Amino acid sequence: ANRLFFIFWEACKADNRCYGICYLKNRRSGFSFMSSSETVNQATISSDARFGILSKTGADAKKMFTDKVVPISTHYPFFFKPIQDGMDRPKTELAYRVPASKLTRKSITSTTKSNTDALEGLDTTIDWKNTGDNSYDGEKLRLLVHDESGKWERPDNILNNWRVTKTTLRLGS
């Protein structure tokens, strides 16, 4: 069943008109883990992109991020893993970019070879947001995982959020 899911997912990614999949599933089918692995996979091969996670509550989105996305990234082999900024087990954002370095007068005026051979990062991030109608408003997302979106609690509404996130996905593609 997972093979068919990923074949269909590849077809969705190839179609520019497609925003994604509304995947209805049985309990304990592993969708959260499959979507987390696809998020990390896409993030490690994309440059200058943003990936997001929303769930039925902000606590569930954070749990998906810390318990699924971060361990998948942590267990990547060193030859697939891009340069990462921040902690090895982040709580809010997984950033594939070159860590910031302190600017000094010497480093600004220096024209040594080390400045010209600077590392290049992907400038890609994966993060999660609290559940809300305006989550990810005004941002550009390459991929958004709506986990358990049918279980949103009032007053938040998935339809109102979709009006916002549809535009962010269109801008980020």
Model features per residue range: what roles?
Residues A1-S173:
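Phosphate/NTP-binding elements of NTP-utilizing enzymes
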